[in-house]
Regions:
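Long, low-complexity intrinsically disordered regions
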Residues: 1-285
Length: 285
């Protein structure tokens, strides 16, 4: 059985700087968080060191080995990450939703067109691709524009909690609906709206799927320095063949070098911490 390639130490140090896994560059405010998301392009919300990729929670902790505790309510770092998430959603300067494969992510505005090209759908496709419950929820939101979870369940007629959640998740994954606020009193509820209301230009911009795959790969590799087999797919939710197509497009333009099957690294002129031709990396030829 083939072993999983290891990330070299110099690449981990590169990621420490890019993904704010350093105590001197911790995220402490919503403004810090928005700058972090803009710099990395996209980030998970509450993943820890056990999952690859940039993460708001890890950036709040400011260390590479951050692990989410079981009791998040009593943990200062987990609580701060949760509070920042809610504030970022209210501010509406970056995109936040549960996207492909159920991954809850933040997107910088510049990355929205590329993710939408992969996961979005045209209005003409909605009746064919969306479930009846998702269509019922969407019909209400297009009429009312913004509504709380409980009111939306009543108005749409999708009163079963699990069925409603699945419908909203469908709409989030298709980049049609986003949360705009969350309230905990007098009862817990999200406020939902159409994504195009918050990010009209980004969601209406048309790009090809091939361009989208290349730019998502570029964004990840710029922050990661190197990617190993399956890593980008795990972070972004892309199928592995699509992740590979994006990475190979970067090789074709000289932005990245392919060191082994599924292993790609930034070239030296694009900021790589090590150049394949000058390193004793096990991936170098």
């Amino acid at each position: 059985m083939r072993s999983t390639p290891q990330i070299p130490a110099e690449i981990e140090e590169y990621r420490d700087e890019r993904w704010r896994r350093e105590a001197t560059r911790q995220v402490e405010t919503a403004f810090d968080a928005e700058r972090f998301i803009e710099q990395v392009g996209f980030a998970a919300c509450l993943t820890d060191s056990r999952r690859p990729g940039p993460s708001l929670y890890v950036a709040v902790c400011g260390r590479r080995d951050a692990v989410m505790p079981r009791n998040v309510q009593k943990d200062r770092e987990a609580s701060l990450a949760w509070v920042l998430k809610d504030e970022i959603v209210r501010r509406g300067k970056v995109y936040y939703a549960k996207l492909g494969r159920g991954k809850t992510m933040f997107l910088a505005p510049r990355m929205i067109p590329y993710f939408h090209a992969v996961w979005g759908m045209r209005r003409s496709e909605e009746k064919r691709r969306l479930s009846r419950n998702a269509q019922a929820i969407l019909k209400v939101l297009r009429r009312e524009w913004e509504m709380s979870t409980s009111d939306l369940r009543d108005e749409s007629g999708v009163k079963d909690r699990q069925a409603f959640t699945r419908g909203v998740d469908e709409l989030q994954a298709a980049m049609i609906v986003v949360p705009t606020a969350v309230y905990y009193q007098p009862k817990f509820t999200y406020i939902w709206t159409l994504g195009v209301g918050r990010f009209p230009d980004a969601l209406r911009r048309r790009v090809s799927r091939e361009t989208a795959l290349r730019e998502i790969a570029r964004c990840f590799l710029a922050g990661a320095g190197m990617t190993i087999p399956g890593e980008m797919a795990r972070v972004t939710g892309l199928p592995r063949p699509d992740a590979g197509r994006g990475n190979r497009a970067l090789v074709a333009e000289g932005y990245a070098a392919m060191l082994a099957t599924g292993v790609y690294q930034l070239t030296a002129r694009h900021g790589s911490p090590t150049c394949p031709a000058d390193t004793d990396s096990p991936y170098a030829e």
